[in-house]
């Protein structure tokens, strides 16, 4: 769409500049009608109208150059609006409806939510291991830092902020 607009405007500018450039170079000579000097003899000139207009001088042609691109752009704009207003099933793919923007956004949100949940689980596992190491160091078994399976908490996913900071909850 952008290329169509730019090409139409470029063509219009080129034709206008061509017309103004070469129309100024054309000299308007006033020669008498009838016999015109041509070398040593006279040439008989046909009766032509005094102000003959070429295709560059026609106002209707320039109006056409200005109106046609405008009409084309308006028709394309209207067809785009109609496409946006029509249901997606009627736009040429009756058997497959394309994903809407809301569905794409919800898929993105689901992916982000799942990633954050996985990150939270990994963080809780890490905090639980650090807490167990801290407990093992406090009990005096500093020489044996390897934790056995029996020292792992029963529910590693249930770690609260109070437990992370070492505060005991009052409840």
UniProtKB/Swiss-Prot annotation:
It comes from the Eukaryota. Residues 74-171 are cytoplasmic. Residues 1-19 form the signal peptide. It is found in: Nucleus inner membrane; Cytoplasmic vesicle, Secretory vesicle, Acrosome. Pfam families: FAM209. Disulfide bonds: none annotated. One of its GO terms (biological process) is spermatogenesis. Keywords: Cytoplasmic vesicle, Differentiation, Membrane, Nucleus, Signal, Spermatogenesis, Transmembrane, Transmembrane helix. The keyword Transmembrane applies. GO terms for cellular component: acrosomal vesicle; nuclear inner membrane; nucleus. InterPro entries: FAM209. Residues 20-52 are extracellular. The chain crosses the membrane at residues 53-73. Its main location: nucleus. May play a role in sperm acrosome biogenesis. Belongs to the FAM209 family. The primate lineage appears to have undergone gene duplication of FAM209, such that humans contain FAM209A and FAM209B. This is Protein FAM209B. It comes from Homo sapiens (Human).
């Amino acid at each position: 769409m952008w290329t169509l607009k730019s090409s139409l405007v470029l063509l219009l500018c080129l034709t206008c500049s061509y017309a103004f450039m070469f129309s100024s170079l054309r000299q308007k000579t006033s020669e008498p009608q009838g016999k015109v000097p041509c070398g040593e003899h006279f040439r008989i000139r046909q009766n032509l109208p005094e102000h003959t207009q070429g295709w560059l001088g026609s106002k209707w042609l320039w109006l056409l150059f200005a109106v046609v691109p405008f009409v084309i752009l308006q028709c394309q704009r209207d067809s785009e609006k109609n496409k946006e207003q029509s249901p997606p099933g009627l736009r040429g793919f009756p058997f497959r409806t394309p994903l809407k923007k809301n569905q794409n956004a919800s898929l993105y949100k689901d992916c982000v939510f799942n990633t954050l949940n996985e990150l939270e689980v990994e963080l809780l596992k890490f905090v639980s291991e650090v807490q167990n190491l801290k407990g093992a160091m406090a009990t005096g078994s500093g020489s044996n830092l390897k934790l056995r399976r029996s020292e792992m908490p029963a529910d590693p996913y249930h770690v609260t902020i109070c437990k992370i900071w070492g505060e005991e909850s009052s409840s």
